[in-house]
Amino acid sequence: MEKDHWKGRGAQLQTGNRFSSQHLVTEHSEGLDEELILSPKTKIRLEHPKTIINPVKSPDIGLSFSLNPYQGCEHGCSYCYARNSHEYYGFSAGLDFETQLMAKPDAPRLLEKQILSSNWKVAPISLSGNTDCYQPIEKKMGITRHLLEVFARYRHPVGIITKNSLIERDIDILQDLAKEDLVQVYMSITSLNEELRRKMEPRTASASKRLQIIEKLSNVGIPVAVMNAPIIPGLNDQEIPEILKASAERGARSAGMTVVRLNGKLEEIFSDWLKRNYPDRFQKVMGQIAELHGGSVKDVEFGRRMKGEGILAEMIHQLFYTSKKKYFSNRTMPKFNLQAFRKGGNYSLNFG
């Protein structure tokens, strides 16, 4: 590993910002050629938006609304599609994405205000549509828990996707929501290979811990599924059967998947990560990612961008659906209950 490797960070570089005419670089003064090797510390800024619920306009996602209590994500996943969104805030999609974070402390109040408005029509709202709502700073900020308290108070359906074990903290609220089919949880598992996980998703829970969480949630009646995403050919595609089997054995009710795409600055960030960590696989992995998307690692075409196309994509999908049929037959996630929503909020809560 190179001497300037920043431990615990997925990105190892700062990418330029497409919205900025200036690009800052480090100048080594006094003729020294020493590289900056100290890992940048995480900084949290408070953001105060006017609204918090975002309509989802992408037709291939299957969601109506999303809510993100945080912008940026300390998990630092090298492949994360959300990195590019950090440029809208004047930051880099690289190291800034995982070190310059924004928290929205007003989110619970704004959620309550929006779902109580006269024109709100109840529909499931997904937490973590962009960045993980249980990333490490949630332990300090607690915004996600307060959001769940609002969902529970008004019996409003909510979906969650995460790769962090902190969700275990909120089992009390999730169990309450599950009693009326008001919650669905998706645990994201990309690899059971701990070495790969540590390199690719440096500040996430281990795969074994995520499987434990699936089991704990399932045992208390909280519907949970596994999200095997993204599939990266040449890195984790061969793990599909094992991941689905392990998740099913611990009580997961369903499974989903997407294939990787490297839009915007992701190509630069991920290829740099791949060269540093798996140089012997670089050509194969990048070539196969391009094969999934018509010859380019980038893909913005709805439908194809998350599924891929061609022979390789068909092989991946066949392996996934064969495994899903084998391990998840006669299992389904419950449909969201849209009838329990109470604008009066006269539901008794006692979560401590």
Residues of each region from the PLM?
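Flexible, acidic/Gly-rich N-terminal and inter-domain linker regions that tether
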Residues: 1-66, 335, 352
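Conserved Radical SAM active-site core
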Residues: 35-71, 75-186, 190-198, 206-219
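Short acidic (Asp/Glu) and glycine-rich catalytic loops that position anionic groups and cofactors
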Residues: 88-91, 264-266, 294-301
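Short, electropositive alpha-helical surface patch
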Residues: 141, 175-189, 236-253, 314-318
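Short, hinge-like loop/turn segments at secondary-structure boundaries
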Residues: 177-179, 203-204, 243-245, 272-276
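Conserved C-terminal portion of the radical SAM core fold
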Residues: 208-268, 283-292, 322-327
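Short glycine/threonine-rich loop-to-helix capping motif typified by GTGT followed
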Residues: 236-242, 270-272, 345-351
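C-terminal accessory regions of radical SAM enzymes
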Residues: 274-352
